[in-house]
Amino acid sequence: MLSFSRVVNCSRTCSRFLGLSLGTASLCAAGANIALLFPNWDVTYLMRGLIGKHAMLGSGLWGGGLMVLLAATLISMTGSFSKSAPCLQVLIALLSSGLALLGAVICFVTSGVALKDGPFCMFDVSSFNQTQAWKFGYPFKDLHNRNYLYDRSLWTSVCLEPSKAVVWHVAFFSILLCISLLQLLLVAIHLVNSILGLFCSFCEKH
């Protein structure tokens, strides 16, 4: 009886820690997505509508951010429902896990696609008469013979504006990718912790 009680208490403490960790990760994801809206901390690109679709989608704000933050709040409150019915505890665990899982997956997929397509920037488009023309777009999206992620020479030679567009894009979307992976790991731990805690609660009552 004592061992089951200790496991249950440990599970509740772990839930609070997981909730705090997920909440912190969600705020970091939101911060990274906000940074992507202001290349080089310049607001003019956002005002002119020259921000890439992946950053404008805001998956780090509402997916890895708000959805995970709501789930983290539910997870942290798990200890408050310690005397409630097991069915309610199961419902809260499933709801919080599903919400965090969905938000993290959305952020992960969007970040992966963004890294694959490359940054939205101004680049040189050579016409048939060899005159120079510039436009905003995704210069690396259809570059099949070279991968810009591994070819650092392309980082400074292709995108003309914003300056260091590739570095900014790769850095913050990589951060979002890592944060979403961490969130997925924390959700998996939360599921295991919830199942263990509920099992021990049943054993403790019987």
From Swiss-Prot:
Stretches of the chain found on the membrane's Cytoplasmic side: 1-16, 76-89, 193-206
Gene Ontology cellular component annotations, sorted alphabetically? actin cytoskeleton; filopodium; lysosomal membrane
Q: Kindly provide the name given to this protein in its UniProt entry.
A: Transmembrane 4 L6 family member 19
The reply on keyword Membrane is yes
Main localization of the protein? membrane
Expression is induced as follows: Up-regulated in gonadal white adipose tissue after high-fat diet. Up-regulated by oxidized LDL in RAW 264.7 cells, a macrophage cell line (at protein level).
Phenotypic consequence of gene deletion: Knockout mice are born at the Mendelian rate and show no overt phenotype. Animals exhibit higher bone mass compared to that of wild-type animals of the same age, because of impaired osteoclast differentiation (multinucleation). When fed a normal chow diet, knockout mice show normal body weight, fat tissue mass, adipocyte size, or body composition. The knockout does not affect energy expenditure, food intake, physical activity, nor fecal lipid excretion. When fed on high fat-diet, knockout animals show reduced weight gain compared to wild-type littermates.
UniProt-annotated stretches for the region Important for homodimerization:
182-192
